[in-house]
Amino acid sequence: YGIEVLPLYRDLAIPGAAKELYDTCQEKNIPIEVLVNNAGMFFFCETLQAKANIVEKMLYLHVTTPTQLCYYFGQEMKKRRHGYILNMSSLSCWLPYPGITLYASTKRYLKSFSRGLRSELLDYGVSVTVLCPGAVATNLYNLSDNLKTLAIRLGIMMRPEKLAKKGINALFHHRASLLPGL
C-alpha cells in the first residue's frame, strides 16, 4: 500500500497518555488522517464493589483519553479540512445494565460525545463515526477459544476482523453511527 507504519506503544489508561501520544506524533511529523479510539477494558461487577484503581483506569481508557485524542488530533484535522475519527462504543450504551453499569455509562458517553463532535466538525471535512457493536470475540471477556468459537457460530459474538471491516466501511462512507449485527 506504500504506507509506512510506526508503532507507538502507550498505556492509554493513565493521565497524560493522549498528550504524550500527540506530542510524539508532532515531533516525528506524523500527520494523523484516521484516528481510531478502540482501546478498552471490561469487568463484570457492581460499580461500588470495583477497586478504585480499576474504575479510574476504565474512565481514562473509555472517556478521558479518547476525548483528549479527539481534541488534539481533531484540531489538526480541522485545520487540514480533512480527517476521520472512529470511536468504539458498545451496544450496551443504549440501556443500563446492572453489573456493567460503569462500562455501559462510559460507552454511552462515547456515543453522545461522538455524535456532538460529528456535528461540530462536519463543515470542516472531518467525519466522526461511532461504532456500537455487541459482543466481539476478543480477549476482553476472558473466554476460552472454544467458547468464543461457539458464540460466533450461534451469532452471539462477532469476529473482530468482520467488525473492523464494517467499522472502516462505515467511517469512509461518512456514517454517523453503526450498530453491526442489528
Set out the residue ranges of the language-model regions.
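Substrate-binding pocket helix/loop in short-chain dehydrogenase/reductase
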Residues: E46-L59
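SDR active-site lid
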Residues: R118-L182
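Active-site loop immediately N-terminal to the catalytic Tyr-X3-Lys motif
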Residues: L48, Y97-T101
